[in-house]
Design a protein with these regions (language model features):
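A common structural junction motif
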Residues: 106-116, 211-219, 330-341
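Non-catalytic beta-strand/loop surface segments
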Residues: 1-37, 61-97, 119, 135-190, ...
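Carbohydrate-associated surface elements
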Residues: 198
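Catalytic glutamate of the conserved HExxH
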Residues: 50, 54
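Short pre-active-site segment immediately N-terminal to the catalytic Zn-binding motif
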Residues: 36-44
Length: 437
């Protein structure tokens, strides 16, 4: 499926992508800032995620939480999210409310700092700390998305530290520290604005120019730290985590080609073969046939610099021990390395991926988000239209070359969750001893 895309850039550097679709009377506004946890420096982590909250706390012309109220009162939905390489904000509104959504996004880009106060900062720091307690510390397996990057990336690497950041860093951050982070990264020349859905192109252009045009470009942002890594870990990395969980779960990561590279598509297809839907290798073998797992999946982080990671995620059945689960997953990965994949497996995986892409592009919100993603990470929103071609070009030989290069035992990082038990000796220690013997 190809979608119409028109793109242009304002004098202040803001890249704008438009995709008209009058199927339904709704329009999506999607703004990606090219800043994520990777842009934070040690001692000042957690700022990108903090701003996911701060940008909803009012600007010079909008009261705290009024952004939510105005959009919802107009019949729309909105949210924001943070990742290692980007932060994004998005609204989907009735077509006649496009001006409102654009004005709100422009106002907080250009007029947030006059309304930023110490009280708001203190309040949102507490909100983030509570979010961490709820979604990470007290959530079963909730620490995986911190611990796996910590295991898979060296401590000097920008992808190593926690996405939500250090609570100590947030507590010690001054208002000036936070304001300077905003001045550096939340600027039009470090952002992509995508609009998709039911709108008139010329009207949208005029609104974008009117609301975003006067915002000055930034002074530039510092370069990321060293990103390049060897293609493999060089060994099997392993960490056992004792947690308040009922069932063991294994996350296994492999260093993988970066998002958008030619080799990435073979890695993505391999992930689909391993863990996409119930017809995948891991699900068929571990869940249906051997019945050692309750669920299995695989996915890439879609990182565009240095190294991506392909992740396998398998949860045990109640009667399966952590050691049995780990052994079973290793056996399936080894079998893939030894036997390779068949062309029909590749074709099935590509069909599933293409179906997902087509379905996503029929949604105004997903369409806008994908244009923003390709524009931010790879420089061109129109790349969304060639993704199906890139996947269709993948053959079994491409996937088998990736498997041979990247899925061996010299390129595995294993994060194994085990149920917490009482006693002087931890479950993690006992498991280590059992496997070692």
């Amino acid at each position: 499926m190809r979608i119409p895309i028109e793109q242009f850039r304002l004098d202040n550097g803001l890249l704008v992508a438009l995709s008209q679709d009058k199927t339904a009377p709704i329009v999506a506004v999607n703004l990606w800032y090219h800043v994520g946890s990777a842009n934070e420096r040690l001692g000042r982590t957690g700022f990108a995620h903090l701003f996911e909250h701060m940008l909803f706390q009012g600007s010079e012309h909008v009261e705290a939480n009024e952004h939510f109220e105005l959009v919802q009162r107009a019949g729309g939905t909105l949210n924001g999210s943070t990742w290692l390489e980007r932060t994004n904000y998005f609204e989907t509104v009735p077509s006649n409310q496009l001006a409102l959504a654009l004005w709100l996004e422009a106002d907080r880009m250009g007029a947030l700092l006059p309304a930023m106060t110490q009280k708001k900062l203190d309040t949102q720091r507490d909100v983030v700390k509570n979010e961490r307690r709820w979604s990470v510390d007290n959530q079963p397996y909730g620490t995986w998305w911190e611990k796996l990057p910590e295991l898979a990336f060296p401590d000097w690497h920008p992808f190593h530290h926690s996405l939500i950041g250090s609570m100590e860093d947030l507590s010690e951050a001054s208002l000036e520290d936070v304001e300077q982070f905003f001045r550096t990264y939340y600027t039009p020349d470090n952002a992509v604005l995508s609009i998709a859905g039911d709108f008139e192109t010329e009207d949208a252009k005029k609104l974008v120019q009117e609301y975003f045009g006067p915002i000055p470009r930034g002074a530039g942002k510092p370069p990321l730290g060293k990103m390049e890594l060897p293609p493999k870990f060089g060994e099997t990395l392993r960490q056992v985590v004792e947690d308040d969980v009922n069932l063991p779960r294994l996350y296994m990561a492999f260093r993988s080609p970066v998002f958008g590279s030619t080799e990435y598509y073979a890695a993505s297809v391999c992930g689909a073969i391993l863990g996409m839907r119930r017809g995948s290798r891991l699900y068929r073998s571990l869940v249906r046939e051997r019945q050692v797992a309750a669920d299995a999946s695989a996915f890439t982080f879609d990182l565009s610099k240095g190294s991506d990671i392909l992740v396998v995620d398998v949860t045990a059945r109640p009667e399966t021990s952590a050691g049995q689960l780990e052994t079973a997953v290793e056996e399936e990965i080894d079998r893939l390395c030894n036997e390779g994949v068949a062309e029909e497996e590749v074709n099935r995986a590509i069909a599933l991926i293409e179906t997902d892409m087509t379905t996503a592009l029929q949604s105004a919100g997903e369409r806008a988000d994908r244009m923003s993603m390709f524009a931010t990470l790879l420089g061109d929103p129109a790349l969304v239209n060639i993704q199906a071609d890139r996947y269709r070009a993948v053959t079994a030989s491409h996937v088998n070359a990736f498997v041979a290069e990247r899925l061996g035992r010299d390129n595995r990082a294993k994060l194994l969750y085990v149920p917490r038990t009482g006693g002087d000796e931890s479950a993690a220690e006992r498991l280590e001893e059992a496997i070692a013997s």
